[in-house]
Amino acid sequence: VVFQIQWAAYLLNSPILSMSGNETSVVYIPFLRKFNPMDSITIRGNLVDCLQRTILPVQMEVRNGKIAAVHSTESSNIDPNLPYILPGFVDAHVHIESSMLIPSEFARMAVVHGTVATVSDPHEIANVCGMEGVQFMVENGKKVPFKFYFGAPSCVPATVFETAGDAIDAEQVKALLGMPEIKYLSEMMNFPGAIAGDEEVLKKIAAAHALGKPVDGHAPGLSGEGLVQYIKRGISTDHECFTIEEAREKISLGMKIIIREGSAAKNFEALIPLIDEYPDQIMFCSDDKHPDSLVEGHINALCARAVAKGYDVFHVLRAACINPVNHYKLDVGLLQVGDAADFLVVNNLKDFKAEATYIDGVLVAENGQTKIQRFIDNINPVNRFGIQQLDVSAIALTANGVYPYPVIGCIDGQLITDKLDLHPAIQDGFYVSDTEKDVLKIVVVNRYFSAPVAVAFIHRFGLLGGAIASSVAHDSHNIVAVGVDDESITKAINMVIACKGGVSCVGRNKEQVLPLPIAGLMSAEDGYKVAEAYTEIDQQAKELGSGLGSPFMSLSFMALLVIPNVKLSDKGLFDGEKFSFYA
């Protein structure tokens, strides 16, 4: 990469060259609240223009954080000796909270992979802390040179069938949408309400439309007349498609499809053929991505996989860079003169490994290392946790003799579950876990106040010993736990309670917990250290027998009622097809 830095007015406590006459000295410019971009940078490389579908060797000038000029060289052929300059990657739908990191730490890791912006739905923290939680995300995101674009959570709480920490009504949604940092109405999970014309739902949608802001969808499996009515409400996207047929139907009715590949839900393989079929209507997202996955890659990894399968590189980059910017009207540059200087530099168009990432002309990552310093001052640990330690008797379930028993069928890599009718084991008059049949006890505990514990059973989780628990439990974020015996389950839950949030694992000879004191969802610690700690506890869960790709992430979705078929809330076992509790 050829960089000619003529003057730098920004740096995060790292050295730059100061040139005065014939003297050159190393100076340090302290951390600034406002990130002043480099005054002038000249970069030579093969510029990938996704709008014109061209790749040309150029000399690009950046001044005051903008693309000031792009000068073509004498040759119109790609120069193999130069790197490629691409628009920055955008994650088109992500819950930052699922990374277990506060926004400023998420940014430090994401820029290493060429990500310059996210379309972020803060409904996880909103379900715990309401408006205060949304404000926390917005303010913390401003601390670093990264482009966080947040949505106004549309469904807090997600349903009336669970206990959340707060609620956000239509008037509060309207107030949020009036903020410049809030770019859209977040996923409308209450698609039955939207279809039926629920007054509160329609008020929220109308508030977004009045300001010209898009409305995100959430409609897994919805088709036919119900889908038609849902889209007629002005809902423009969906990231919940599990089959290509479902996605094609939604596209035919005017929706844009966001291909999701997260730590739990993985729909890339099923949906990637859409990239060449509908290049203007496809985006990429992670939705929910744990910190260990973020260390490995982000949107760049999806680009690499798509190109390796033979899909058109310009179509791939449209999904990763262009379409989110256009759809959500983001202030993210697309390498046109006058645009914000948001771009990355790569050595090839195969692995998309970012050699350097720039945001508003600021070098934020280079050679696999973040250039963004940690922001550690004045972090307010917003949280709501109101329960005491649990006694083992609280999760005992008396056998009532009713057979068969409805059991959650866990599916690795998916958020949907199977509805199974199985026979849990009975011991001394109580239903208990059965490791031989892989039918384990699953528990959801109300974290906000003392209440009866909800108990059910889950198949295909795979634990052979111990238990795991988490206060990350979509969407109300009560405590969810699964295990092979009541003592281990209770111990894992109490470890989470003691930290006022976190993930825990109780094994035969080892117990560990990763504290998440910010809303019981996030840590303010260094993101890479959190990723290390999470990798260790995730590995312990797998050593206990779980064959799931991400046991904690899968567990966190077993309480998500808005995705069928069978889930467990703090109020009981829920039938996602009938949208009611089991009797």
Stretches found by the model and what they are:
Residues P122-I125, P153-S154, N190, P220-G221, ...:
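Short, ordered loop/turn segments at secondary-structure junctions
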Residues G88-V90, F284, V482-D485:
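Residue-level marker for buried hydrophobic side chains located in beta-strands
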Residues E23-V58, V62-R63, A68-S72, V111-H113, ...:
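Active-site microenvironment of metallo-dependent hydrolases
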Residues A167-E187, G193-I258, S263-F284, L294-K309, ...:
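Histidine/acidic residue-rich metal-binding segments in metalloenzymes
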Residues A107-P214, V513-P515:
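Divalent-metal coordination cores built from histidine and acidic residues
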